Curated annotation (Swiss-Prot):
This is Apolipoprotein E. APOE is an apolipoprotein, a protein associating with lipid particles, that mainly functions in lipoprotein-mediated lipid transport between organs via the plasma and interstitial fluids. APOE is a core component of plasma lipoproteins and is involved in their production, conversion and clearance. Apolipoproteins are amphipathic molecules that interact both with lipids of the lipoprotein particle core and the aqueous environment of the plasma. Sequence repeats lie at residues 77-98, 99-120, 121-142, 143-164, 165-186, 187-208, 209-226, 227-248. It comes from Dicerorhinus sumatrensis sumatrensis (Western Sumatran rhinoceros). Residues 77-248 are annotated as: 8 X 22 AA approximate tandem repeats. Residues 207-283 are annotated as: Lipid-binding and lipoprotein association. GO terms for molecular function: cholesterol transfer activity; heparin binding; phosphatidylcholine-sterol O-acyltransferase activator activity; phospholipid binding. Heparin binds at residues 159-162, 222-229.
Amino acid sequence: MKVLWPALVVTLLAGCRADVEPGPEVQLGKEWATWQASQPWEQALGRFWNYLRWVQTLSEQVQEELLSSQVTEELTALMDDTMKEVKACKSELEEQLGPVAEETKARVSKELQAAQARLGADMEEVRNRLAQYRGELQAMVGQSTEELRGRLNAHLRKLRKRLLRDAEDLQQRLAVYQAGIREGAERSVNTLREHLGPLAEQAATMHTLVSKPLQERAEAWAQRLRGRLEKAGFPVGDRLDEVREQVQEVRAKVEEQANQVRLQAEAFQGRLKSWFEPLVQDMQQKWAELVEKVQLALRAVPTSVPSEKQ
């Protein structure tokens, strides 16, 4: 835990971008090239991003499609796919929280919901800005649209920067929470092994101590019975009463041993329960502390957008 947590915080803070940029387009392209799209929602967002970059070229084909509703419809479909995958990822993570306290689970859900909402708002603003540009473009048919395209290009650069920032924020939050879940699960397994190992050894020893006397007594009784039958020349009927008495004696001893085993098993069960109850409470407390540290680290990440260089 002490080793993993600083590494997670360093990874989280490493996502902050520098304020100095060689150029908006070059810097954005360079940053997006490092985007790790391993999750379905990340891949869906990558498709949205690539389509937006194509729109921003404002080529002749883009200009033609902007005059219709094709571009906004395509962006809407890509946005819906992205948000669908984000919700699925969030739901899966919340299921993995399982045994943690409801208060902790609610805090995590609230943090992820806010990050998800910011990402959705960014994509919604991109779509609305292009719809606005479409209306402006239709109103200026036959006139020069150079200035209009310049304003759109500058606005899209800012929106792309904000989209990338919020996407990385959501990605980092999910990664930190997932790493916390894995670390907590591994620590819990190791703790269980440490506690159950001695108990398992004690149970094995108890079984040996109980079964060995029973086996030895049964063998001794069988030898005595065999010797007596041989001496009697197999007149079993004459010694039937004696055999019955010996059988009853062995049965009584077996029942006595079985009762002792039952009592020892009940004591073992009570001891096992006393081990587990504080362990579960400790797991819940440690997980709540882990989530609290994650949230403090995330709040420390700068959220302001660096100023655009004109």
